[in-house]
């Protein structure tokens, strides 16, 4: 049985997205459509980093903001991704929207967000998620689930009243893209692909159409 959330190829209309000149504007259009069609987390993206031995790591994270300066996500600074980004501040992202038969690939350099940005976003999180950020030692060995629940209980007891401040080891990163590629599924694997490249954030984008 086919998935009713996935648009059949016969209903796909490629539009004229290959005529776009601003990749951020096109990203905003595609994300808006994904917000309507994706059943879960349209802002989910695969984040790829590299360890000191050159081996890649990839995991799903949630994009929590974007503008023409880049794409933002948050996590623990001492996590595996945080350590790898500190050693090699370059990353790749992938958005895949199955319901739309589209994907966007992004490569770029990574910089930490400001404390002001991190504080502002942390304040919007549910209190239980804020407590979890204090209780978790992300990517470190965990003796048992019970040990984690004990840590959560201790943090909860400390913050029964009032706001929960942002942990000093929890913050965010911004990926400033040097390359953004848009891919749209077409019948018989004759897909549409366009790629935007720039040498630095101050340079204009160069657009190229790619073979599928």
Swiss-Prot record:
It holds the Pfam family PNP_phzG_C. The keyword Oxidoreductase applies. Its EC number is 1.4.3.5. It catalyses: pyridoxamine 5'-phosphate + O2 + H2O = pyridoxal 5'-phosphate + H2O2 + NH4(+); pyridoxine 5'-phosphate + O2 = pyridoxal 5'-phosphate + H2O2. GO terms for biological process: pyridoxine biosynthetic process. FMN binds at residues 59-64, 74-75, 81, 103, 138-139, 183, 193. GO terms for molecular function: FMN binding; pyridoxamine phosphate oxidase activity. Keywords: Flavoprotein, FMN, Oxidoreductase, Pyridoxine biosynthesis. Pathway: Cofactor metabolism; pyridoxal 5'-phosphate salvage; pyridoxal 5'-phosphate from pyridoxamine 5'-phosphate: step 1/1; Cofactor metabolism; pyridoxal 5'-phosphate salvage; pyridoxal 5'-phosphate from pyridoxine 5'-phosphate: step 1/1. It is an enzyme of class 1 (oxidoreductase). Transmembrane segments: none annotated. InterPro entries: Pyridox_Oxase (IPR000659), Pyridox_Oxase_CS (IPR019740), Pyridox_Oxase_N (IPR011576), Pyridoxamine_oxidase_dimer_C (IPR019576), Split_barrel_FMN-bd (IPR012349). Binds 1 FMN per subunit. Belongs to the pyridoxamine 5'-phosphate oxidase family. Catalyzes the oxidation of either pyridoxine 5'-phosphate (PNP) or pyridoxamine 5'-phosphate (PMP) into pyridoxal 5'-phosphate (PLP). Homodimer. This is Pyridoxine/pyridoxamine 5'-phosphate oxidase. It comes from Rhodopseudomonas palustris (strain TIE-1). The lineage of its organism: Bacteria, Pseudomonadati, Pseudomonadota, Alphaproteobacteria, Hyphomicrobiales. The gene is pdxH.
């Amino acid at each position: 049985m086919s998935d009713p959330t996935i648009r059949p190829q016969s209903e796909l209309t490629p539009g004229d997205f290959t005529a776009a000149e601003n990749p951020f504007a096109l990203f905003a259009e595609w994300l808006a459509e994904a917000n309507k069609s994706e059943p879960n987390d349209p802002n989910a993206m695969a984040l790829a980093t590299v360890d000191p031995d050159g081996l890649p790591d990839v995991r799903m994270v949630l994009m929590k903001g974007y503008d023409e300066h880049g794409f933002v996500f948050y996590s623990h600074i001492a996590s595996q991704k945080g350590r790898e980004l500190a050693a090699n501040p370059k990353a790749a992202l992938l958005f895949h929207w199955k319901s739309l038969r589209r994907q966007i690939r992004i490569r770029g350099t990574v910089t930490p967000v400001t404390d002001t940005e991190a504080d502002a976003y942390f304040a919007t999180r549910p209190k239980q998620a804020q407590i979890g950020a204090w209780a978790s030692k992300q990517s470190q060995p965990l003796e048992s689930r019970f040990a984690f629940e004990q840590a959560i209980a201790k943090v909860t007891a400390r913050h029964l009243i009032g706001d929960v401040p942002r942990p000093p080891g929890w913050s965010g990163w911004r990926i400033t893209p040097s390359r953004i590629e848009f891919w749209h599924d077409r019948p018989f694997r004759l897909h549409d692909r366009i790629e935007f490249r720039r040498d630095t954030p101050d340079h204009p984008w160069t657009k190229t159409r790619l073979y599928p």
